[in-house]
């Protein structure tokens, strides 16, 4: 099942319905164990339109965020002690329902009942330049941020906030 984010696709868009029915008449789903043309084509388009040279497809936002968290942990495992492998997230965020993404989500209502939660996460106020500056330090290895928070009340990042985070990370 897909999450609520798919609602952004609208309702019965003719172009989307046509694409879905054309694909359904060919092949539905094969998992990532088989190479098929549509994801290969999409991967090439994503690489061409971005800074990346690789693509990792996931089934959900939670799975994508979990993979990002694991990548950070694995990448920093040999180079940094455990207390210097922190991931910063923001109040009002929602990153998924896996154990790591629930922990990255700084909302107790989603974390309650799942303790003890994994360590290595820190939280700061969303859109607060000064608090972000205080939170990001030598122990920070990643910043997990939503440009537009949905669960927190449809809160867009203030102008310059994401750029400021990027500068702090550099």
What is each stretch, according to the model?
Residues 81, 90-149, 153-161:
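PLP-dependent aminotransferase-class I/II
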Residues 33, 125, 170:
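Active-site-adjacent loop/helix segments that line or gate small-molecule/cofactor pockets in enzymes
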Residues 1-3, 8, 59, 66, ...:
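Short glycine/serine/threonine-biased micro-segments
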Residues 1-3, 134, 166:
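Beta-strand scaffold of nucleotide-dependent catalytic cores
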Residues 1, 12, 157-161:
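Residues at alpha-helix caps and immediate loop-helix transition turns in enzyme cores, especially N-
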Residues 2-82, 86:
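Glycine-rich loop-to-alpha-helix module at the N-terminal edge of alpha/beta enzyme cores
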Residues 73, 159-170:
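Surface-exposed amphipathic alpha-helices with a cationic face
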């Amino acid at each position: 099942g897909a999450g609520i984010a798919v609602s952004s696709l609208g309702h019965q868009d003719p172009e989307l319905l046509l694409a879905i029915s054309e694909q359904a008449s060919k092949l539905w789903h094969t998992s990532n164990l088989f190479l098929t043309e549509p994801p290969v084509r999409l991967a090439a388009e994503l690489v061409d339109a971005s800074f990346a040279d690789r693509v990792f497809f996931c089934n959900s936002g939670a799975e994508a965020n979990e993979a990002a968290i694991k990548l950070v942990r694995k990448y920093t495992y040999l180079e940094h002690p455990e207390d210097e492998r922190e991931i910063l997230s923001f109040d009002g965020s929602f990153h998924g329902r896996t154990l790591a993404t629930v922990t990255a989500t700084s909302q107790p209502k989603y974390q309650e009942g799942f303790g003890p939660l994994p360590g290595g996460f820190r939280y700061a106020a969303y859109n607060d330049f000064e608090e972000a500056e205080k939170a990001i330090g030598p122990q920070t290895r990643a910043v997990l941020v939503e440009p537009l928070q949905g669960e927190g009340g449809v809160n867009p990042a203030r102008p310059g906030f994401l750029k400021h985070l990027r500068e702090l990370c550099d």
